[in-house]
Amino acid sequence: MPQTTDKNKTLLKSRIFLPIIFISAFFFLGWGYIGHRIINYRTILSALPEMEFFNTWADSLEAHASDADQRKSWDPDEGPKHYIDIDNYPEFIATGTINQNFDSLVAIHGYSFVMDQGILPWAILKTADSIEAAFEINDMHKAMLLAADLGHYIADSHQPLHITRNYNGQYTNQTGVHSRYESNLIGNFQSQIIYDGDSLQYIANLSDFVFNMIYENYQYVDSVLYADSVAEAYAGNHNSYTYYNKFWEIARNFTIGLFQKASYRITCVIYTEWINAGGSTNDISENKNYLPSGFNLFQNYPNPFNPSTTIQFQIPNSSFVNLKVYDVLGNEVATLVNEEKMKGEYEVEF
């Protein structure tokens, strides 16, 4: 059994429930070098036709996807831009949020503390501002290089182990999980990481957008650790095909979902900065409730939960939806949805 920390004790004391959804429809339905290339390249899936420059960017965004990682070898200021140990902030543990203003946060905790925890959200915001400035002077090459960096940072924010103090499983007796998840697992199963783009949204408040996606993605920290723990117990090791196959079996759905959201959100930020620099807003709607292009069942949040949790799902066609909750022993706990649903995005509370 893994050694327990305060955070892990909360996990062990909570019952873990697994939402399972059955669909009857007309149709049946941090990422390392490889992961960053996939995420950056697939930003084009959500691009609008009028953004012609994006057609020439896709290969370059992929090629430069890891430039930011390479800079860490010679730029001492680069490293903290790739992570935030957000659960080292007492207010995050208490409220689920932190102060978004960097100077205000420094005034509360001190500069050294804030830098030690990482500055990922502010790296995203600063890079986005720089992209807008490049668009304003029509320096498209610089905008592309900055967009590649933006993609890297946003992708890091969708790698759960980049946004926690337990980034390498060192507090849960799972040392090495970081590379096992973002590099080895993704490398072994990259051919199965398939997803579509979606309708763009203009981002009215970029700071809220960036911090909210980090808060949202934090819920998957325990999901990654759980998948690693179960896979190791199943295989008796953490370096065999059996281990990685079980790891992927558990982590596949939420991992592909994180990839899809990362690519989509990168494109939304780039489009927002292009619009802010004077581009057209045709066909882009602010905070649009888009219709999904594929079926998705997202990780419930919070997880672990007490006393309630929220489960989100998307369906691409009018379907009969049966959503049930099971405990880890396979016992049915509750039926949350059992009815016809129109195409769209839904959430239910349990």
Positions of PLM-derived features:
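N-terminal secretory signal peptides that target proteins for export/translocation
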Residues: M1-L12
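Bacterial N-terminal signal peptides
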Residues: L18-F27
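N-terminal, motif-rich segments that launch catalysis or mediate targeting to/interaction with membranes
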Residues: L29-D149, R165-I275
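Catalytic Zn2+-binding segment of zinc metalloproteases
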Residues: A155-G169
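Short, compositionally biased serine/threonine- and acidic-rich segments at solvent-exposed termini, linkers
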Residues: T281-K288
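C-terminal outer-membrane/trafficking sorting elements
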Residues: K288-F350
